[in-house]
Amino acid sequence: EREIYVYGTNIYELYEKVFLGNEDEMDSIDLLQKLKEKDSDNPILDEKFSDIILIFDYDPQDNRYSEERIKLMLDYFSESTENGKLYINYPMLESYKHFKSFPDEEYIKRKVDFELVKKGKYKEIVGKEAKITKINKFTKDVFNEIIISNIKKANYITSNLEDLKSIKEIYN
């Protein structure tokens, strides 16, 4: 059975809660205990977990943004069965719907100026450009196309390969 706990804030708040002032005690940090300090009445935090998955937006527009903090958290939260596994939506969750048409052949190579993201303008850009906006209206085919497009985009960013055949070749 899977249970989801929503932390309800951003990655930099997590950093401050878990790591700030605890740099010398990183081997003994108890994530669930830190979460209980914020939300002591939530019974899910008393459960035992086989895996902990942390999903946050990158949020470079936050005034607490720091590449060093991101690197520290990625290093620390690197295994779901130990300290937890951190996944970061880049630049934020809204990126999944940044399709100007559907399907959108340019999606894989679409870039946004990082300075605009840091200024908090990305959501506005997606709001103006996105062809798909309401997640509750998505069909299975639309979800599949979004997933395939994002796999292709990740493959293009990391390996400069544009097709799924290339992805399969990497893993064979």
Regions found by a protein language model. Name each.
Residues R2-Y5, Y12-K17, N22, K34-N172:
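C-terminal accessory helical subdomains adjacent to catalytic cores in phosphodiester-
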Residues L31:
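A surface-exposed, charged beta-strand/loop segment in the N-terminal or early-internal portion
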Residues S28:
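N-terminal carbohydrate-binding/catalytic regions of secreted carbohydrate-active enzymes
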